[in-house]
Amino acid sequence: MSVTLHTSHGDIKVEIYCESVPKTAENFLALCGSGYYDKSPFHRVIPKFMAQTGAPATPNPPENPKGGRSIWGGAFEDEIRPALRHGARGVLSMANKGPGTNGSQFFITFDKAPHLDGLNTVFGRVIGDEGLATLAKMEAVEVDRKNRPKEPVRIENVTIHANPLAG
C-alpha cells in the first residue's frame, strides 16, 4: 500500500504498513481519502529530527479541533511493534501526547530517532529518491525559535495508489 503526499516542496511517496499496524493504517488512509490532510501545514520542522503535520488546515471545533482527530472522533491506542523502529530518515510515525492519544497528526523523520521507539507508532516509510529529495528541501526551510517554518510548507493533497479499504 502506498500513497503520495503532494507537498508545497515536492512529492513524497510513502509505503504504509497496513498489516503490521492495521488501526493506524486505517485511520491514516481514511483521512487521506477524505481530503482531511489537504492543505494541512507542516507546523513543526526540526532539522536533523523531523517534520510534523496532520492538523486540519482550518480548525473548526468540535468537528476539527486544532490538534486534529482520528476517524473515530477521539484518540486511539498505540500500535507499538518492536520490529518497527525510528531507525532511519523517512520514517512515518504518529505524533501523540502520551500513550493512547493518537489522532491525525504524524511526523516524518529526517534522521534516526531511537528515543521514540516504544513511544510513537511507526506506520510507514518514504520510498524513492524523489521523496527523500523533498524531505531535504523541507529540512532546509528556515524556522523560527519555536521550529515553525517561516515559509509555508504543507500537504497540498494526497494520492492513494492502492486502497485496501475501498470495496
From Swiss-Prot:
Q: Does the keyword Isomerase apply?
A: yes
The organism sits in which domain of life?
Answer: Eukaryota
Q: Which GO terms describe its biological process?
A: protein folding
Q: Name one GO cellular component term.
A: catalytic step 2 spliceosome
This protein's UniProt keywords: Isomerase, Rotamase
Which residue range or ranges hold the PPIase cyclophilin-type domain? 1-160
The record ties this protein, via Pfam families, to: Pro_isomerase
Q: Which InterPro entries match?
A: Cyclophilin-like_dom_sf (IPR029000), Cyclophilin-type_PPIase (IPR024936), Cyclophilin-type_PPIase_CS (IPR020892), Cyclophilin-type_PPIase_dom (IPR002130), Cyclophilin_A-like (IPR044666)
Q: Which reaction does it catalyse?
A: [protein]-peptidylproline (omega=180) = [protein]-peptidylproline (omega=0)
Q: Which EC number applies?
A: 5.2.1.8
GO molecular function annotation: peptidyl-prolyl cis-trans isomerase activity
- Kindly report, in one word, the top-level EC class recorded for this enzyme: isomerase
* Biological function: PPIases accelerate the folding of proteins. It catalyzes the cis-trans isomerization of proline imidic peptide bonds in oligopeptides.
Q: Which family does it belong to?
A: Belongs to the cyclophilin-type PPIase family. PPIL3 subfamily.
Q: What is this protein called?
A: Peptidyl-prolyl cis-trans isomerase-like 3
State the organism named in the record. Gibberella zeae (strain ATCC MYA-4620 / CBS 123657 / FGSC 9075 / NRRL 31084 / PH-1) (Wheat head blight fungus)
